Amino acid sequence: MRELYLKTLKKEVVPSEGCTEPIAIAYAASIAAEHLKGEIKEVNIYLSKNVIKNALGVGIPGTGGVGIEIAAALGISIQKSYKKLTILSNFTEDELKKAKEIVDENIINIKQKNTNKALYIEVELLSETSKSKVIIEDTHTNVTLIECDDEIIMDNNSEVSEDLEEDYKLFKIADIYNFAKEADFDDIKFILESAKMNEKVSEEGLKGDYGLQVGSKIIQKGNFNLFSNDASNKIIAASAAASDARMDGCAMPIMTTAGSGNQGIACSIPVAQTARLLDKSEEELARALVLSNLVTIRIKKHMGRLSPLCGAGIAGATGASCGITYLLGGNLENINYCINNMISDLSGMICDGAKETCALKIATGTNAAIQCANLAINGISATANDGIVAKDVEETIESIETLIQNGFKNVDDTILNIMLEKKKNNK
């Protein structure tokens, strides 16, 4: 399992600038633009409901704008698809100007794709003499089709290893814990970069007036701050501030986990902040981050790549709580307690799209992560008498999948309908 865990971490913990759904749209649009001949006259974008939900209202770094149109237009303008999830980093003023001109021309059409896939992006570009099409499915960089003028340039479903994806469900918490505890430090120290990268964004979020300023207001000095200046509030503030900045379009890279920057924030910053407060070594932090990330990836596999439930608030925060428990000296039993406590607490947190209020959910999840770690380290756990929690932590995690598949079938449709109706009424 050692090689599988390392391969998984290197595949699922990767940098991105901006929210991953609009970036994936920009990536697809960039590839399509690179193959089109002539001046673009029409842009047709077909998206799964989950992608629309997560791209509709989120800030696009460096643009001052939000949403799908500007992301797609930037991809067309930039045409640097080799950058993948960092395609929106360091674009020029001329590229931004061209993108805004494309948006202003009103040639971008966005439609919902009738598909069972949670993550589906299709971008079709038309000129007077040419047509190109690109499809991304399942994960944010998995290009399955490139077509230009009815010629198939690439038709490939092999980039995503379905075997590896399915293996995530086989990751047992006991095995993850043992790997985190026993792995050679030289093999896992690369994971420290996730904390360093994400804490830089947190620092920016605490300094600037980003989004709802959830993080900065927790630690502000003044007569009207009800939060005390204690360790837990500093951890919550640091975590929320990174999301404040990211969701408001801060042009800094974030290390994602399982396809999401907010999941990366949620499972790394609380762990790094706790390690610093406890004066832990880099090796101890790396082991806690490995545990946190792998638990996040395992839970997220049961939730789905995109989900009606909040991946950062549930999977990411549960990973963080496990990492915190580990840093506090917790053993496997304490880790199991921690997971049962977290899922008992946060399993109903919905995902109503990527937007500035994600920082509120990060704050809520981080608070729960600290609270549940504290209970777990004291030998206190939710039991099989409590709701969807099972005696076996593996069954508790699997119950999330059952909840989504059987209980939340229509939730995404309902959420998206509310969002689109609101957008229509606000025009």
Curated annotation (Swiss-Prot):
Superkingdom as given in the UniProt entry: Bacteria
GO biological process: L-cysteine catabolic process to pyruvate
Paired cysteines (S-S): none
InterPro entries: Ser_deHydtase-like_asu, UPF0597
GO terms, molecular function: L-cysteine desulfhydrase activity
Any Pfam family the entry gives: SDH_alpha
Coiled coil feature spans: none
PANTHER family given in the database record: UPF0597 PROTEIN YHAM (PTHR30501:SF2)
Family: Belongs to the UPF0597 family.
Protein name in the entry: UPF0597 protein CPE0806
